[in-house]
Amino acid sequence: MAKTLLPGLRLLRRLGVGSLGGGFRVLLFHDIPKEHFRFFERLLEHILAVRGVITPDQAQALLSGQVPVGCQGKIPMLLTFDDGFQSQARVAEKILDKYGVKAIFFICPGLIDIPPEGQREAIAKYIFDGKHGEDLPGNLRLLSWSEAESLLASGHTIGSHTSFHRRLTGLGPEELQGEVLGSGELLEKRLGISVHWFAYPFGNIESIDPSSYELIRSHYEFSCSGIRGLNSNQTHPLALLRDCMDPMSPLDYQEFVLLGGLDFFYRRRARRLHVMAKNADGIH
């Protein structure tokens, strides 16, 4: 793979892609097992050295056209974690806090409330879209409410990832309200915070629709997808693009993603997402 990507990497660097200021990328991570921590830390060190990491507040400033101090002349990264796996709390404690990095953790409060003995089947059914519990890694767990509180105490942000990680498209009105609005309300009640960030499950363009957007915009300021691309002040705050990252992937591939090498293949889906978000606002 490294040899295949080298020409593309050289071209992107020659064109200066990934070094122009005013935009930012949102990186998406899921479960990170303990044996992968060192690879995640290696990736984080590279990002900090070459591009920098921003906070959710700095991302908001960039969306409004401001360029925070330290972001001039480069495209920084905002780190996000989906699904609320227990491993993410360990990553925050052992690695993010060590480097002073603040991230967003999108969690499913309905799944957290399931007793431990039923969580594996719930993770398989909802997060892994129909798998069985015995098919999952043995140490896969969801974080607890106390761990969510610890993330907040360390300066991280908690966002909603719906109540049970159900695909929003195809749900009836009551089910949709429970997933989108009920999740935010439960997070606010249990954690004593205001929830401004949302990430819809599965992240692809087929997993979001206009009726979902109507509810999202009624409660949240920002909504993240899983569609790759660069965000800027032209990006609708409810149509934020994210690049899924695997800490175990080759370094050349990671750099290719960070430089936007895959954006071209997602541009139409990104456009559809943006139009849907604008239509929810009544902007045509």
What are the roles of these predicted feature ranges?
Residues 94, 149, 213-214:
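Alpha-helical segments flanking ligand/cofactor-binding loops in enzyme cores
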Residues 85-86, 164:
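Short active-site segment of divalent metal-dependent hydrolases/proteases
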